[in-house]
């Protein structure tokens, strides 16, 4: 299980947000499995 950037506003209910990442200057949630 690797943490991934999600190109949407929210992480899934099975994930938790641990920070932000930038993709082309836009911030997205950085999500990890719980």
UniProtKB/Swiss-Prot annotation:
InterPro entries: Alpha-defensin_C, Beta/alpha-defensin_C. Its main location: secreted. GO terms for biological process: defense response to bacterium. Belongs to the alpha-defensin family. GO terms for cellular component: extracellular region. Disulfide bonds join 3-32, 5-21, 11-31. Pfam families: Defensin_1. SMART domains: DEFSN. Microbicidal activity and inhibits corticotropin (ACTH) stimulated corticosterone production. It is found in: Secreted. This is Corticostatin-2. Keywords: Antibiotic, Antimicrobial, Defensin, Disulfide bond, Secreted.
């Amino acid at each position: 299980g690797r943490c991934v950037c999600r190109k949407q506003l929210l992480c899934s209910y099975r994930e938790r947000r641990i920070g932000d990442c930038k993709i082309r200057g836009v911030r997205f949630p950085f999500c990890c499995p719980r």
